[in-house]
UniProtKB/Swiss-Prot annotation:
It catalyses: Endonucleolytic cleavage to 5'-phosphomonoester. InterPro entries: RNase_HII, RNase_HII/HIII, RNase_HII/HIII_dom, RNaseH-like_sf, RNaseH_sf. HAMAP family: RNase_HII_B (MF_00052_B). This is Ribonuclease HII. It comes from Clostridium botulinum (strain Langeland / NCTC 10281 / Type F). The keyword Metal-binding applies. PANTHER family: RIBONUCLEASE H2 SUBUNIT A, RIBONUCLEASE HII.
Length: 269
């Protein structure tokens, strides 16, 4: 759209163009967008000025997210630009029911800036919808990923500490490529025959760990929703097996199901 004669262009057309910029921002140069904002802000119409202000706010937010994303990529790249780095994280350590799940993800850390995956962060800080969207993108862009689980019966037999380490180990060992380095969240993975560095609050610092956190959570949440179809009295579709008041009361009323961790229910039954 040619904005040289902006005063002759209808508001609705300008708004459509503004919305297109936001949707297809990667196809525009930053300077080009800044020039458009300047023209919109000089228009005598208040509603057009508001479009310029909204576009400027969008640009600032995008710049902040770009910086945050680059920091997460650079955190992993500091270990070596030519390294294959896997991030690994688990979800489901604390629930009363269901498996513990881990994912390992190897990303291309040297992709061009605009090809990087934006909005990646600790899965707990994302909405369910955003996690689902990012799960698809991560799987598509990953060099390799693998999801592993340890079921409730094994958790009861071997204990949660063993199961937690085992599921992380299985996730890494199931990758189709062998990484040079494994980054884990919070603590080291024992008995792993690959160099391993653990990162405190890794899912907020490392793009690889945060990515693994997201696909592990999406996988487990969807699994618990499937279980809920035959065990709807426990509310697995929204509590994911965690010990909410509703869940605890259901256990007391109906007893445990086949996917409950009996070793976690000693204070309930």
């Amino acid at each position: 759209m040619n904005l040289n004669n902006l005063e002759n262009i209808r508001y609705n057309e300008i708004k459509e163009f503004s919305d297109k910029i936001k949707k297809e921002f990667t196809f525009f140069q930053k300077k080009q967008v800044m020039d458009i904002i300047e023209k919109l802000n000089k228009d005598p119409r208040k509603n057009v000025i508001k479009l310029g202000q909204a576009l400027e706010k969008f640009l600032n937010k995008y710049e902040e997210e770009l910086k945050r994303t680059n920091n997460m990529y650079n955190f992993d790249r500091r270990y070596g630009n030519n390294y294959l780095i896997a991030g690994v994280d688990e979800v489901g350590r604390g629930p009363l029911a269901g498996p513990i799940v881990a994912a390992a993800v190897v990303l291309d850390l040297n992709v061009e800036e605009m090809q990087r995956i934006f909005n990646i962060k600790d899965s707990k800080k994302l909405s369910e919808k955003k996690r689902e969207e990012l799960d698809i993108i991560i799987r598509e862009k990953a060099i390799s990923y693998n999801i592993a689980l340890v079921d409730n019966k094994t958790i009861d037999e071997r204990g949660i500490s063993w199961s937690n380490n085992e599921v992380l180990k299985r996730a890494v060992e199931g990758l189709k490529v062998k990484p040079d380095l494994v980054l884990s969240d919070g603590y080291a993975v024992k008995n792993l025959n690959i160099r391993n560095e653990f990162i405190i609050k890794g899912d907020s610092k490392s793009i690889s760990i945060a990515s693994s956190s997201i696909i592990a959570k999406v996988y487990r949440d969807n699994m618990m929703k499937e279980y809920s179809k035959g065990l709807n009295m426990y509310g697995f579709n929204h509590n994911a097996g965690y010990g909410t008041e509703e869940h605890v009361q259901a256990i007391k009323k109906y007893g445990p199901s086949k996917i409950h961790r009996m070793s976690f229910l000693t204070n309930i039954l």
